[in-house]
């Protein structure tokens, strides 16, 4: 980590349903705590969807795997999306996302005073990680799933920024319309100061 990130090519058919891993810090817990209130609620679902792609459909259909809110077995949602591909590149990537998701579910409970429905699935993922169709390997640099028309890409720093700073720029330029921290966490210092990088 700490290297300049390389954007994965985002195919038009995968960006239609945007998924992301908001790596606002290399530390998975800190990255969760930095997310705005809206993302804390939304990303619990997306991270569960990303982690589901690590398991075969037959494993997801087994009786011990928690069902969706509608009572159906979990399916693979957008498995060719860059964030899904990154999650499955190595067990280290998967473990980073598990730690990040765990911290995000904690944030959800802190900010909204209730348990998120997907938390049971995350617990199942942790218990069954060795059933995942993911090879052991090192943590790779985060994928950047930010569309080409995003405002942050017009910032002269974007092309040379680390993955963390690219996502911070994304927050600063593209998420300010709804990025609020009103549920028990202050906005991160870098967001308050609109500053990224060293």
Model region roles, listed by residue range:
Residues 5-80, 84-198:
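Sequence termini and other peripheral, non-core segments
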């Amino acid at each position: 980590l700490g290297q300049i990130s390389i954007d994965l090519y985002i195919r038009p058919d995968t960006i239609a349903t945007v998924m992301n891993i908001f790596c606002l810090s290399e530390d998975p817990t800190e990255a969760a705590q930095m997310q705005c209130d809206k993302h804390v609620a939304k990303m619990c679902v997306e991270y569960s969807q990303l982690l589901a792609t690590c398991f075969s459909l037959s494993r997801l259909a087994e009786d011990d795997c928690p069902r969706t809110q509608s009572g159906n077995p979990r399916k693979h949602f957008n498995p060719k999306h860059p964030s899904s591909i990154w999650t499955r590149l190595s067990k280290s990537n998967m473990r980073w996302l598990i730690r990040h998701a765990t911290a995000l579910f904690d944030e959800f409970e802190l900010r909204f005073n209730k348990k998120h429905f997907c938390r049971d699935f995350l617990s199942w993922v942790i218990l069954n990680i060795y059933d995942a169709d993911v090879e052991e390997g090192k943590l790779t640099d985060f994928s950047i799933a930010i569309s080409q028309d995003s405002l942050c890409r017009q910032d002269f720093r974007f092309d040379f920024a680390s993955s963390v700073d690219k996502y911070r720029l994304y927050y600063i330029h593209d998420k300010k319309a709804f990025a609020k921290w009103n549920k028990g966490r202050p906005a991160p210092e870098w967001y308050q100061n609109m500053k990224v990088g060293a």
